[in-house]
């Protein structure tokens, strides 16, 4: 457990990590959207595709062979898990900070009670 005075900076660092991962996630999602838009464009303008089901199948084929798209999807999955872990760590630090503050308050109350008890006894 950290010292009480170290929690705010640790919490700020953990929140910054969540923001960094979130930023990376948005960049990867933007890249995925571009790949999907390109696949939509390719499938929309192929004249031999006669219905929506054929266009969807062609879109799927285009995305399936795109290695960059596959890498981006893997990165998206990894970053999503990383973000969830970062959020869990942030919440853990916040909860630890709350517990540390309560323990500090309890220690102060116990010291005051001990002091008052000694005064009553006349020590």
Which residues does each predicted region cover?
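N-proximal short alpha-helices
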Residues: 1, 5, 52-55, 59, ...
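Long amphipathic alpha-helical coiled-coil segments
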Residues: 22, 29-36, 71-108
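Short acidic DE-rich linear segments
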Residues: 116-123
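Short, charge-rich amphipathic alpha-helices with coiled-coil/heptad character
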Residues: 1-20
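Intrinsically disordered, low-complexity acidic Ser/Thr-rich regulatory segments
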Residues: 59-76
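Generic detector of low-complexity/intrinsically disordered segments
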Residues: 65-66, 104, 122
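Extended alpha-helical coiled-coil "stalk/arm" regions
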Residues: 24-63
């Amino acid at each position: 457990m950290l010292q009480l005075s170290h929690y705010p900076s640790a919490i700020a660092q953990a929140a910054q990590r969540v923001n960094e991962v979130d930023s990376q996630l948005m960049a990867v999602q933007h890249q995925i959207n571009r790949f999907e838009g390109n696949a939509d464009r390719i499938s929309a303008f192929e004249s031999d595709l006669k219905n929506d089901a054929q266009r969807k199948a062609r879109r799927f084929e285009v995305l399936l062979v795109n290695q960059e798209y596959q890498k981006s999807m893997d990165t998206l999955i990894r970053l999503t898990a990383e973000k969830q872990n970062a959020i869990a760590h942030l919440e853990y630090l916040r909860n630890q900070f709350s517990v540390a503050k309560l323990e500090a308050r309890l220690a102060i109350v116990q010291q005051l009670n001990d002091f008052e008890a000694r005064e009553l006894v006349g020590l």
